[in-house]
């Protein structure tokens, strides 16, 4: 009887030990999972001008970015600043963003097409203002594939001349597949961001974007996730 009791005690001890070990492992695994999921990146995109509102001057836009930097530093919030080409070529933004610590801030490309980029690429500007928010002018979709590549080359060359490296990320309300693939292959970007859905805003509509988290984009349409 004593042998049976001893045997049962050993089994019970092993069961309790394994249960505790498994519980500890599960907690560690859950903790690791939660840590992996806590990914937040603040993105501010910068345009030089805003022709839709007279009171939003170039100075107002610049001071807005200065304030954003102050707040992010105050609360120790890292993030990314995407520069539209007209802002990229402005010495105020160059000086401000070059001074940011690289371990907390990233500088990337904002892919809307303003007048200076088009003209520096050797093309005629068709917009109503130096930056036009309509899709046939303000986005790469308004240009031929060859023109899109030239626009990308001009932007990247000037970005590297100013910052000493090519941007690793790019953002836009909409990036076409040809442009994104070209910039990925030629300049080795590792990430991009886009708008998911909007109806009748800014002179165009988009629908059917992939919500929730990061994804590998489809080679047919960037707002859709790759099926494989």
Can you describe what each PLM-predicted range is?
Residues 22-30:
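Bacterial Sec signal peptide processing site at the extreme N-terminus
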Residues 1-8:
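Bacterial N-terminal signal peptides that target proteins for export
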Residues 40-44, 79-81, 107-110, 168-170, ...:
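Hydrophobic faces of well-ordered beta-strands that scaffold small-molecule active sites
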Residues 18-19:
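C-terminal motif of bacterial Sec signal peptides marking the signal peptidase cleavage site
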Residues 168-228:
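Active-site-adjacent pocket scaffolds in enzyme catalytic domains
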Residues 29-103:
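Active-site beta->alpha N-cap acidic-glycine motif
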Residues 47-50, 62-72, 157, 161-162, ...:
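Catalytic grooves of carbohydrate-active enzymes
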Residues 85-173, 228:
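Metal-dependent polysaccharide deacetylase catalytic core of the NodB/CE4 family, i.e.
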């Amino acid at each position: 009887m004593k042998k049976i009791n001893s045997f049962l005690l050993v089994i019970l001890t092993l069961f309790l030990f394994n249960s505790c070990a498994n519980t500890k492992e599960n907690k560690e695994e859950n903790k690791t999972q939660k840590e992996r999921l806590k990914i937040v990146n603040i993105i501010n995109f910068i345009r030089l001008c805003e022709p839709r509102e007279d009171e939003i001057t170039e100075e107002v836009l610049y001071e807005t970015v200065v304030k954003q930097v102050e707040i992010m530093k105050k609360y120790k919030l890292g993030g990314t600043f995407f520069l539209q080409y007209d802002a990229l070529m402005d010495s105020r933004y160059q000086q401000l963003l070059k001074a940011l610590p690289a371990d907390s801030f990233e500088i990337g490309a904002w892919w809307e097409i303003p007048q200076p980029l088009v003209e520096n690429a050797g093309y005629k500007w068709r917009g109503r203002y130096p930056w036009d928010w309509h899709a046939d002018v303000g986005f790469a979709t308004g240009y031929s594939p060859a023109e899109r590549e030239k626009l990308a080359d001009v932007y990247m060359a000037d970005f590297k001349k100013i910052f000493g490296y090519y941007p690793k990320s790019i953002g836009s309300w909409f990036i076409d597949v040809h442009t994104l693939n070209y910039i990925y292959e030629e300049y080795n970007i590792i990430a991009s961001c886009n708008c998911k859905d909007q109806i009748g805003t800014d002179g165009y509509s988009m629908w059917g974007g992939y919500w929730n988290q990061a994804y590998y984009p489809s080679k047919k349409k960037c707002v859709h996730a790759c099926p494989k």
